[in-house]
From Swiss-Prot:
PANTHER family: 50S RIBOSOMAL PROTEIN L31, CHLOROPLASTIC, LARGE RIBOSOMAL SUBUNIT PROTEIN BL31C. GO terms for biological process: translation. Part of the 50S ribosomal subunit. One of its GO terms (molecular function) is metal ion binding. This is Large ribosomal subunit protein bL31. It comes from Bifidobacterium adolescentis (strain ATCC 15703 / DSM 20083 / NCTC 11814 / E194a).
């Protein structure tokens, strides 16, 4: 590898707005980063995700093609 062309890759402490903190490695300038959402509070990872039906498109699709039974 060429010397002096790669960014500094170092440990960074990340703090989420929910209070969760963890350490990762990054090229971010600084030793501390604040984020709004992390895997501890994101709806996808917590299981609280909701499907948004915009304009009844899902209902119209299910009516047209039928909802498959599991």
């Amino acid at each position: 590898m060429k010397q002096g062309i790669h960014p500094d890759y170092h440990a960074v402490q990340v703090t989420c707005s929910c209070g969760n903190t963890f350490v990762t490695r990054s090229t971010y300038n600084g030793d501390h980063m604040t984020v709004d959402v992390c895997s501890n509070c994101h709806p996808f990872y917590t299981g609280k995700q909701k499907i948004l039906d915009t304009g009844g498109r899902v209902a119209r699709f299910e009516k047209r093609y039928g909802k498959k039974a599991k």
